[in-house]
């Protein structure tokens, strides 16, 4: 069986979200009339959290490679492309370790 095209899902997404918001709005009005606002506020905050996480997930799906490309540049350097490979050896630190430690009085 043919798999659904990803674009079809994205085209149906706004209608689904608007339908869910419409349903939530009518439920909000019913609960407003019954004065049960704690449940409504909880549902609104939960919906906000879910929509925010969904938005972050979708944005990462679209722009994740671009963001990763900004931080990781393959090349001669080490991690993130800015540190040379031989920089893990710090001879100045080794020489400083051999010196006697100075106190604040000296």
UniProtKB/Swiss-Prot annotation:
The chain crosses the membrane at residues 9-29, 44-64. Its main location: membrane. One of its GO terms (biological process) is osteoclast fusion. The modification N-acetylalanine is found at residue 2. Pfam families: T_cell_tran_alt. Residues 30-43 are cytoplasmic. It comes from the Eukaryota. It is a multi-pass membrane protein. Glycans are attached at residue 80. The keyword DNA-binding does not apply. GO terms for cellular component: membrane. Residues 2-8, 65-106 are extracellular. It is found in: Membrane. Keywords: Acetylation, Glycoprotein, Membrane, Transmembrane, Transmembrane helix. The keyword Transport does not apply. May be required for cellular fusion during osteoclastogenesis. Belongs to the TCTA family. PANTHER family: T-CELL LEUKEMIA TRANSLOCATION-ALTERED GENE PROTEIN. This is T-cell leukemia translocation-altered gene protein homolog. It comes from Rattus norvegicus (Rat).
């Amino acid at each position: 069986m043919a798999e659904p095209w990803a674009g079809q899902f994205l085209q149906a997404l706004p209608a689904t979200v608007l339908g869910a918001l419409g349903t939530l709005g009518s439920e909000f009005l019913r609960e407003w009339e019954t004065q049960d606002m704690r449940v409504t506020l909880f549902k609104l905050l939960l919906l906000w959290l879910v929509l925010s996480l969904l938005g972050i997930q979708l944005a990462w799906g679209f722009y994740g490679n671009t963001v990763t490309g900004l931080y990781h540049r393959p090349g001669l350097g080490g991690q993130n492309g800015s540190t040379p490979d031989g920089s893990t050896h710090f001879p100045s630190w080794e020489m400083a370790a051999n010196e006697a430690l100075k106190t604040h009085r000296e």
